[in-house]
């Protein structure tokens, strides 16, 4: 990504479409262990809806508000699982993801667009109902570890206060 720092269009394409541009990422999408884990949830017939790389630069205030992915993908009630891989340490200090366990059972809730400058979501979208932060769990991952979550699950992440980037990769699987 350093080589692309002065080429924002190319960097944007890489972050948004790693499965189409990076052979190693395309191989990860088809990893038998990953497919087995996702198949246990969705069944054997899977399709990749999309993928992306998420970079939180070191010592930045960037964050992600509480949200549900399916509210802005146009898939409302899809049977979907996101596999989120840590490509670097994902700790509380580096802004790891936070989940509210069981919140996916609430289905879709109202969201609002804030367009907040430091929010990493495209429109600064956030859940417009109260989220009990005390129920949240931190998803701390080492490089190479992954978490799975449904697009209805309430999730967020804080800023990266460490000296290193926090980098993650997401692969979104759906039933065709």
Which residue ranges define each predicted feature?
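Double-stranded beta-helix
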Residues: 92-158
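Aromatic-acidic/polar surface patches that form glycan- and anion
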Residues: 23-30, 76, 133-142, 162
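Short, surface-exposed loop/helix-turn segments at secondary-structure junctions
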Residues: 9-12, 68, 121-133, 163-165
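Residues that flank catalytic or metal-binding motifs in active/ligand-binding sites
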Residues: 21, 49, 79, 93-95, ...
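Short, solvent-exposed loop/turn segments at secondary-structure junctions
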Residues: 54-56, 71, 90-92, 104-105, ...
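Non-heme Fe(II)-dependent double-stranded beta-helix
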Residues: 1-75
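Short, conserved beta-strand element in jelly-roll/cupin
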Residues: 41, 67, 74-92, 140-143, ...
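Non-heme Fe(II)/2-oxoglutarate
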Residues: 3, 146-148, 152-176
